[in-house]
Amino acid sequence: MRASPCISQPAASWHPRPSALRPTAGSGPDTRTPGTVEDGSAPCPAFRSPAVSPCGEEPCCFQISPAEETLELGRLVSPGNCDTLSPRAAGFYACHVRSLIPCRSTKGRWPLTASAAGLSSFSG
């Protein structure tokens, strides 16, 4: 039995490829349009608290909340994994394919903290 994707988005045009799930920072100029499904990106609503639905085995979306916390499955992870829109402009952030990794692979790999203060070192 397959679990549903974490994100509540129509998945008709969102097909992350396994080869695209690896980090690609610095691979070249970024010509994508945040908030669209072009080139495998998908818009994600910003979570306002860590209380998000648990995830199955589908790829999950990382997003940064208005409090500048990066949330994934209700846990805080490195904000370096997200491409963001202006938090005040549309109220949501764009998570691209490179920010989507299988849920199980995050276990024990990312720094967890209870507040955004612990993530300040990642802002650069």
UniProtKB/Swiss-Prot annotation:
Expression sites (tissue/organ): Strongly expressed in testis. Weakly expressed in heart, placenta and skeletal muscle.
GO CC terms: cytoplasm; nucleus
Keyword Nucleus attributed: yes
Compositionally biased intervals (Polar residues): 1-11
Region ranges (Disordered): 1-42
Keyword field: Cytoplasm, Nucleus
Induction per the UniProt record: By p53/TP53.
Entry's localization field: Cytoplasm; Nucleus
Function: May play a significant role in p53/TP53-mediating signaling pathway.
Protein name per its UniProtKB record: TP53-target gene 3 protein
Originating organism: Homo sapiens
